[in-house]
Amino acid sequence: DEYEAAARKLASLLGIEFCDPTTFDAERLMYWPSCCSDSQYVYQVYDNPFCSLKGLLGMYGDWHDVSQWPQVPGADAIERRRLAKQEDPTTKRGIIGAFCRTYSITQAMEKFIPGMYEETDMQGRYTYTGGETTGGALVYDGDLFLYSYHSHDPCCRQLVNAFDLVRLHMFGDKDDEAKEGTPVN
């Protein structure tokens, strides 16, 4: 969980506006940065420490608090586009629509997965209790959707409705066994 907080802080010192929003995904840590196909990748190796993890994290009031992490300018526009593409889950037919008409995100949290998320002081922000960071789960669009930045959360990096929130927490391990193209309903 330290990687994203440290990477964002370092990027803010160097110029976060030059970073792609996916730069801070933990899986990026193990790969070389990309470059255009017709360009030469240039890098240099230094055997001295570049910066201190403890020092970077110490620059935060509380590095566990996701709301303190620097953001790439315009990254919120990506979230708005993602939300705009989502169909209102209460208008869906079948069990998913029925579930979402019966339970909002917060009602589903309380009824089916109590204790998995804790409300923070900031309206619409929750903390996934199975992780180390705080305030990384955001409720959107009048309690219809949740998007989680918590890396240990089964809903991490997914915009989910109430049905999918519960499904991923209670039965997400079954997805590994499902064949590609299996409908969720």
Task: Indicate where each model-derived feature is located.
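Residues in well-ordered beta-strands of folded domains
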Residues: 30-33, 125-129, 149, 167-169
